[in-house]
């Protein structure tokens, strides 16, 4: 890069420092996989504003690539588990969740999912032990004098490192199973009467039966997640900190929660002052397409194009399913751009082109795009909302069924089950979403809502990180409920006291009435006898 451009970039970063009043040092404890894609957008913006960002990278991480992030600093440390072990487990989790897990109720799939997540938790406990027991690494972090730690709470340990370094920390989170982390650690208020539990597949206005299912799911996830986290993790945290503690107690010291969702996707519920919703922070205006792709899109004429992508984490599907999908795509008049990394289907039509990679945001922002076939990942959904494109949802795993259920409830999508859908089902869904203006109208309303914010989601995320650095925390925003034991938080001691008082008063009243009754009965008998 020419020297004058380096100087200009340096001056730009310095100007951001003066504007914010402080150029800080940010330590990051990330999670791998698609979670890294979301957090990296925030980190890049922090660097652009002149902050120094250091990412702790376990050697077992395979998705997080330092070579693709030249502006960030990385501290890579060795782990006792290998990259292949973590990758193989993740692939196994995807395959089982996508093709084997029952989807009737949370109770039907939870025993299988429970075993997968237990193993996943073990991997991250091992990585955490490798990090905090690395004396050379911890000494270097201590000497670096970081201002704040930014972490993903699904990969526990960032809070422990922040505690050891005596620095404030904040979380970036999409969801946790059953909203357990949000409720037990963040004290989020999520009444099961009208807030669907994540992974329940419910959305919008719930019937009585739905609310019964929702309550059962909530109770199950609360019980399951308690068992998942409260043995080895608690013991380990207590050993490292040198005092009896729990992982929940340490995590509850978080200053700010940045939730990667927003009210265009979510349904309303009560929130807290130390929680901000930053869904769609990666969305941006479309850029021009590559020349050959633009020519293909323009060749669609008035019919337009359909964009088909099942995300970055799924590379292929069964040959039978791919052929069924390709056949349905060949029946529509639109041109189709399909992100697919498998064997070319025999039924692929002349209107469909297959790509190993697509500029998804740029395609969704193209004026000729009519519909988006998606697995329901939050990133893709927000790009579709941002550009106002109706969807055909084929959810695979994680929160995707819930995300698509929300879009269906808001009238912006049609949902299909990848295991049971036929080629005719897929064709019918395509024709419904493309030809019925109902879906376009509803998604455009969501798009308008998303764009009508006083501050962009990315700017809000950066603001809160800088806020924590400026003020050394945000204790004034944390609910006092964090300092209460569970029985006080739920007012069980007050309820018990009031019930006791009521019981005592009731008992005294009954005794007084009995005494008066006996007194007057005896008096009446005495008068009769006289």
From Swiss-Prot:
One of its GO terms (cellular component) is endoplasmic reticulum membrane. Induction: Constitutively expressed. Its main location: membrane. InterPro entries: UDP-glycosyltransferase, UDP_glucos_trans, UDP_glycos_trans_CS. Keywords: Endoplasmic reticulum, Glycoprotein, Glycosyltransferase, Membrane, Microsome, Signal, Transferase, Transmembrane, Transmembrane helix. It is a single-pass membrane protein. It is found in: Microsome membrane; Endoplasmic reticulum membrane. Autoacylation in vitro. Its EC number is 2.4.1.17. The keyword Phosphoprotein does not apply. Glycans are attached at residue 316. Residues 1-23 form the signal peptide. The chain crosses the membrane at residues 494-510. PROSITE patterns: UDPGT. It catalyses: glucuronate acceptor + UDP-alpha-D-glucuronate = acceptor beta-D-glucuronoside + UDP + H(+). One of its GO terms (molecular function) is glucuronosyltransferase activity. PANTHER family: EG:EG0003.4 PROTEIN-RELATED, UDP GLUCURONOSYLTRANSFERASE 2 FAMILY, POLYPEPTIDE B38-RELATED. UDPGT is of major importance in the conjugation and subsequent elimination of potentially toxic xenobiotics and endogenous compounds. 2B2 acts on various endogenous steroids, especially etiocholanolone and androsterone. Belongs to the UDP-glycosyltransferase family. This is UDP-glucuronosyltransferase 2B2. It comes from Rattus norvegicus (Rat). The gene is Ugt2b.
């Amino acid at each position: 890069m020419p020297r004058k451009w380096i100087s200009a970039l340096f001056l730009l970063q310095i100007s951001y420092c003066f504007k914010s009043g402080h150029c800080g040092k940010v330590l990051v404890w990330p999670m791998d996989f698609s979670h890294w894609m979301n957090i990296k957008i925030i980190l890049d913006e922090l660097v652009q504003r002149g902050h120094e960002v250091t990412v702790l990278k376990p050697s077992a991480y395979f998705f997080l690539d330092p070579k693709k992030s030249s502006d960030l600093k990385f501290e890579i440390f060795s782990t006792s588990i290998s990259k292949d072990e973590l990758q193989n487990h993740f692939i196994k989790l995807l395959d089982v969740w996508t093709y084997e897990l029952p989807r009737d109720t949370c109770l039907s799939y939870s025993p299988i999912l429970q075993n997968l997540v237990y193993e996943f938790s073990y991997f991250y406990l091992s990585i955490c032990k490798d990090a905090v027991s690395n004396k050379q690494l911890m000494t270097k972090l201590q000497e670096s004098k970081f201002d704040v730690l930014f972490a993903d709470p699904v990969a526990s340990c960032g809070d422990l490192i922040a505690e050891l370094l005596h620095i404030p920390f904040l979380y970036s989170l999409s969801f946790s199973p059953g909203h357990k982390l949000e409720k037990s650690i963040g004290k989020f208020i999520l009444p099961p009467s009208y807030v669907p539990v994540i992974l329940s597949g419910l959305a919008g206005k719930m019937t009585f039966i739905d609310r019964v299912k929702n309550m059962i799911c909530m109770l199950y996830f609360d019980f399951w997640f308690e068992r998942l986290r409260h043995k080895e993790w608690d013991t380990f945290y207590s050993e490292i900190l040198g005092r009896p503690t729990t992982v929940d107690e340490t995590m509850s010291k978080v200053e700010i929660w940045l939730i990667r969702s927003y009210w265009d996707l979510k349904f309303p519920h009560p929130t807290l002052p130390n929680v901000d919703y930053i869904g769609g922070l990666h969305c941006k205006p479309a850029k021009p397409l590559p020349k050959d792709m633009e020519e293909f899109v323009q060749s669609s004429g008035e019919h337009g194009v359909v964009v088909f992508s099942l995300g970055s984490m799924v590379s292929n599907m069964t040959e039978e399913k791919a052929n069924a999908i390709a056949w349905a795509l060949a029946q529509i008049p639109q041109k189709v751009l399909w992100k697919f990394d498998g064997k070319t289907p025999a039924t692929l039509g002349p209107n469909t082109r297959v790509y190993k990679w697509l500029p998804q945001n740029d395609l969704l922002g193209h004026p000729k795009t009519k519909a988006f076939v998606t697995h329901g990942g939050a990133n893709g959904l927000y790009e579709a909302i941002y550009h106002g494109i109706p969807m055909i949802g084929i959810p695979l795993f994680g929160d995707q069924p819930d995300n698509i259920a929300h879009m269906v409830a808001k009238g912006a999508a049609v949902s299909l089950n990848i295991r049971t859908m036929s080629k005719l089902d897929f064709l019918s869904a395509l024709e419904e979403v493309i030809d019925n203006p109902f879906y376009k109208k509803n998604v455009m309303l969501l798009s308008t809502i998303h764009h009508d914010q006083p501050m962009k989601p990315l700017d809000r995320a950066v603001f809160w990180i800088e806020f924590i650095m400026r003020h050394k925390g945000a204790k004034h925003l944390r609910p006092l409920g964090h300092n209460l034991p569970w029985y006080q938080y739920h007012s069980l001691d007050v309820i018990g006291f009031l019930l006791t008082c009521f019981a005592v008063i009731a008992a005294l009243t009954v005794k007084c009435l009995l005494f008066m009754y006996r007194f007057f009965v005896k008096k009446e008998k005495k008068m009769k006898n006289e």
